[in-house]
Amino acid sequence: MNRSFATTAATLALAALATGAWAQKTELLVYTALETDQLKAYTESFQKTNPNIDLRFVRDSTGVITAKVLAEKANPQADVILGVSATSVAIFAAEGMLAPYSPVGFAALNPMYSDSKRPPYWVGQDVYAAVVCYNTVEGAKKGIPKPESWADLTKPVYKGQVTMPNPASSGTGFLDVSGWLQSMGEAGGWKFMDQLDANIAQYTHSGSKPCRQAGAGEFVVGISFDFRGNDVKQKGAPVELVFPKEGLGWDIEASAIMKNSKKMDAAKKLMDWVATKEANEAYSKNFAIVSHPDVKPSLPHIPADLEKRLVKNDFAWAATHRDAILAEWQKRYAAKTEK
């Protein structure tokens, strides 16, 4: 009787311990620039295989997240960086803030879209590229033609009808500016931006906002990025998406572990998920180019040859010169930024 009672008590105690261990959750603080309409699906996908890890997001535009991470360098708060531009994440790596880690399944990914070091300091998820959203109804009403090139947007007919993101606050804005400087040369890039600025009505803090503005008819043209352009058109706005013939600036949504994280095991689990085929299938619902070569996105309003339209992009150059580029841009054009 006593032995049976003792055995039962021990069994119950072990069960209670096991239940407690199972129920105990780890919370990761994740800094992200992902769109809010992407985070829910990504979180659900991750937690299917990691139910004991909760993700608490601090979400803002790329420029704000970049400034926040750098400001916290002496006392980092985040455990993981998720979906922030590779140009910014490369800066964090150069500042010694990241932990190198090769996720399970990393070898299957396209090496072109992740850090070249082994083990990598950051892992790419997908490519996002410049797009011009043109409102066909407002364009016809105002006699403003659909542009076909970046050069077209400097013509007088577009004066006061173009919006684009401020590169200091928006990763989309920075990929535009970096792409122009790299493809046109620095002198040519600044000359182009001087001419474009004459037609700009407003610089926004969001990469999505210019396309939404064009979709709503607030302005005829919005310089944005492919995900938001496809989304706005898919929802029925009267927009045509233009992929300027000179080539498209682009960046990579990248993820990394902060070196000082005290939850390294959970952080590695999140990075393992980032590299999975399942995660890439989730990205492919939003982007036309993802890191896993076996995942073939097909978005209705994005050209199948998008990859061929991308300009050459030196991420190391962009990361090294980012501060100087932004300082010069702010000096020349910031007066038109929305309040």
Language model region names:
Residues 24-90:
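Early extracytoplasmic/lumenal segment of secretory-pathway proteins
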Residues 33-40, 63, 77-218:
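Extracytoplasmic ligand-binding site segments that recognize negatively charged/polar headgroups
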Residues 87-91, 215, 219-238:
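A ligand-binding cleft/hinge motif common to bilobed small-molecule-binding domains
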Residues 99-107, 122-123, 151, 237-249, ...:
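Short beta-strand->loop
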Residues 111, 157-165, 192-197, 203-204, 235-259, 274-297, ...:
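Periplasmic-binding protein-like
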Residues 133-138, 178-181, 251-263, 282-283:
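A bilobed periplasmic-binding-protein/Venus flytrap-type ligand-binding module shared by bacterial periplasmic
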Residues 300-339:
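Extracellular/periplasmic bilobal clamshell ligand-binding domains
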